[in-house]
Amino acid sequence: MCIRDRDKVKLVNGSQFKELYNEQLANQGDDPFDYTGWDANTDWQDEIFQTAFITNNNISITGASPKHSFYLGVGYSYEQGNIEHEKFSKVTINASNDYKITDFLKVGFQFNGARMLPADSKQVLNALRATPIAPVYNNEYGLYTALPEFQKAQISNPMVDVELKANTTKAENYRASGNIYGEVDFLKHFTFKAMFSMDYASNNGRTYTPIVKVYDAAVNGGISTLGTGKTEVSQFKENETKVQSDYLLTYTNSFDNGNHNLTATAGFTTYYNSLSRLDGARKQGVGLVIPDNPDKWFVSIGDAATATNGSTQWERST
């Protein structure tokens, strides 16, 4: 999958931007901007987008007899995002079984499970807002370039997020859901069905904030540090459970040789939902930079004096 020109947002180029910006400054009565060093013609969308690869693989087994049906499927998906370094993968398993024990009794179950590694997603917005007159990279300093004075307080070079902060979030999501049911026919016209369903999700993630330096001709030495200038690690863990039970009684009958049909259904449902989430973060200690190594991205490695934390939890039922 690739981003074609027709799919990109149409923006002005470097010379067109200068023309429009000059008009804005003149209308505001402001001094003209000094474009020295700002003569690039950067297409930021071309810089951040990539030709992406997608694969989906599935295999399944099915079986059936007059009294029994069975299904088992396993799948694997891998996707690269339109933005460089973004990638997503998922493994799934699905199973179902229905069995007719007697002419009046049927039981079955269904199960769906998944393990997902979400993408460390980045934004396109900065690439749409960043001025095209800014160069991407300064070869002399070996650093990405800060944006001009009129922009750098609001946004940074889009490549900072895409390249320097690539793969700084590691997350795992697990999901398991399913149901079991039993259905019985009795007294010729009645059917009673009971179903119990459960949905369980467990998500966890870690995010690393690196020290980011960019080339900025407006500062002494030409090197500027973005943000706090300290490394940081944050973590979260979230578990959610949903349980539901449904009970249905159905009456069906025909009258007048089938010219009139009657179906009546009554039932009730119970529902339970619980969630528990913990969040924590720590910055580096004095002179103790947290390594850019996922094996070290745990809050216990940071300075306890800088710790922040939070939590969310609830239980609900109907």
Residue ranges and their predicted role:
Residues 74-80:
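Transmembrane beta-strand segments that form the barrel wall of outer-membrane beta-barrel proteins
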Residues 25, 47-52, 61-65:
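Outer-membrane beta-barrel initiation region
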Residues 4-42, 51, 81-88, 92, ...:
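Surface-exposed loop/interface segments of Gram-negative outer-membrane beta-barrel transport/assembly proteins
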Residues 71-73, 108-109:
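Periplasmic plug
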Residues 64-67, 99-103, 184-190, 253-257:
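Outer-membrane beta-barrel strand-turn architecture
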Residues 53, 57-63, 315-318:
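Structured alpha-helical segments in the cores of large, soluble enzyme domains
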